[in-house]
Regions:
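Alpha/beta-hydrolase active-site loop
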Residues: 209-230
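Catalytic active-site module of serine/aspartate enzymes centered on a nucleophile-bearing elbow/loop
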Residues: 389-392, 397-433
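Accessory cap/linker subdomain of secreted extracellular hydrolases
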Residues: 262-346
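Cap/lid segment of the alpha/beta-hydrolase catalytic domain
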Residues: 157-215, 394-405
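Short solvent-exposed beta->alpha transition segments
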Residues: 7, 22-69
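Conserved alpha/beta-hydrolase "acid-adjacent" motif
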Residues: 360-366
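N-terminal cap/lid segment of alpha/beta-hydrolase-fold proteins
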Residues: 108-150
Length: 433
């Protein structure tokens, strides 16, 4: 029997207070473990204790189901000796942790219901529930289908790392729902779907040989086929749009499925993920110089683990404890051997690359330069930078931080408009049928 989400969240808080961060890490849904090491949890908690003093009381948790897939977000108000905050724990339908945040005290109550962005017109399209793929690892999704009639251009959305739902819910934001409704309002059919690590996290966790290809390719290929076979869709204009790790993997998807007409790469990384994680932890630590020293042991441990992945001695037998975040070697062997920019260059398909200027997770200097080096001289490749946007393509000012994601906002209308214009006008060479 699955434990109630509120009980799970309170247990996690108890573990944090007792310093049992390795046990919390074991509760993470795979491959979320590839994003947040136990040392990072410990450093974040230690920083709050240094800043606010010991915990003096724990309030009543508030649970919020977030829609299809069974994800529940639990918010626990916590009072410290010198302040308050909210511990936000996301629990999947089968009991895994999909995320932990130390949020401001104002986040103790759930946000209001998601509201459509101004650029979405629900009267111009219909949302339809679909199943993507077949067999035990099929995943539920939503097809946003314009009412204007076909043949329509269409796009399948690939979300980033971790157990993402079809809306790519991050904090109080739903960037994929924004994007889907915005594109459908402009005449593009959009298919978004729960990741296999979200819909079937417990089954995936049993597979030690699980790779990045397993994480994306089966459902992405099925989504492309679903769109190509839909009577309202132009089979010669079915695209893939990937965000974050989904953008990194999009060229591999297109290589595996030649019917893909082109790619939209949204903040896709070209720096290896295990080194990007080190950079991100260092950046987050720099936002608060008073507690930056607490992150140094985490950064040193992550650096050692990243070097192990790069080592020629890495093999399937390498102990999990020596690898980033305890994720088994097959995942890293697959990811290490993949060069996304080279894969994109080999495709010979039109590509739109969009990047936020304030993004600290995927950056101009560390990642966009990789795409530019391989693709900038290609006439069928368009690269656009939105200076004010963060990793979710939400505009803002000043240094970006994880706290931004707790503020309900919408994807930049300029990004949605540019993607829609590109999808509806780009020249493709894939036969319609």
């Amino acid at each position: 029997m699955t434990t109630a989400p509120a009980t799970t969240a309170l247990t996690v808080l108890d573990m944090a207070q007792a310093g049992r961060f390795a046990e919390i890490h074991e509760l993470f849904a795979p491959p979320l473990r590839a994003m947040v090491p136990p040392e990072a949890l410990q450093a974040a908690w230690a920083a709050e204790i240094d800043r606010r003093g010991p915990v003096t009381s724990v309030g009543t948790p508030v649970s919020e189901p977030t829609g299809p897939g069974g994800l529940v977000v639990v918010r626990i108000p916590v009072t410290f000796e010198r302040g308050e905050l909210t511990v936000v724990v996301s629990v999947t339908g089968d009991g895994w942790l999909a995320g932990i945040q130390l949020a401001p005290a104002s986040a103790a109550q759930p946000p209001g219901p998601w509201e459509p962005p101004p650029y979405a017109d629900p009267g111009k399209f219909d949302d339809q529930d679909v199943m993507v793929g077949s067999g035990p690892l099929a995943v539920p999704g939503t097809l946003s289908l314009p009412r204007q009639g076909g043949p329509l251009p269409a796009v399948a959305l690939l979300s980033g790392s971790g157990p993402n739902d079809r809306d790519e819910t991050v904090g109080r934001n739903k960037p994929f729902k924004d994007l889907a409704w915005g594109l459908a309002s402009r005449g593009v059919a959009v298919l978004r779907f729960d990741k296999v690590t979200y819909a079937h996290g417990r089954e995936v966790a049993k597979d030690r040989d699980f790779t990045v290809s397993d994480e994306y390719l089966p459902q992405a290929t099925a989504a492309i086929h679903l769109l190509r076979e839909h009577p309202a869709v132009d089979a010669g204009r079915v695209f893939v749009a990937g965000h974050s790790l989904g953008g990194t993997i999009a060229p591999r998807v297109a290589a595996a499925e030649p019917s893909v007409a082109g790619l939209v790469i949204m903040a896709g990384g070209t720096q290896p993920q295990y080194w990007a994680a080190v950079r991100q932890v260092r950046y987050i630590a720099s936002l608060d110089p008073a507690t930056a020293a607490a992150a140094e042991p985490t950064i040193e441990a992550m650096t050692r683990q990243a070097r192990t992945v790069d080592s020629p001695d890495l093999s399937p037998a390498t102990p999990d404890s020596e690898l980033p975040f305890g994720v088994p070697a097959p995942y890293w062997l697959d990811l290490r051997g993949y060069d996304p920019a080279a894969a994109a260059a080999a495709l010979g398909k039109p590509i739109l690359i969009v990047q936020g200027g304030r993004d600290y997770q995927v950056t101009l200097a560390d990642d966009l330069t990789g795409w530019q080096a391989s693709l900038a001289d290609r006439p069928d490749v368009t690269i656009r930078v939105y200076d004010a946007d963060n990793h979710l393509f939400v505009p803002g000012s000043g240094p970006s931080s994880p706290a931004e994601y707790e503020t309900p906002q919408h994807v930049d209308p300029a990004v949605v408009a540019d993607i829609a214009d590109w999808l509806t006008t780009v020249q493709t060479e894939v036969p319609s049928r």
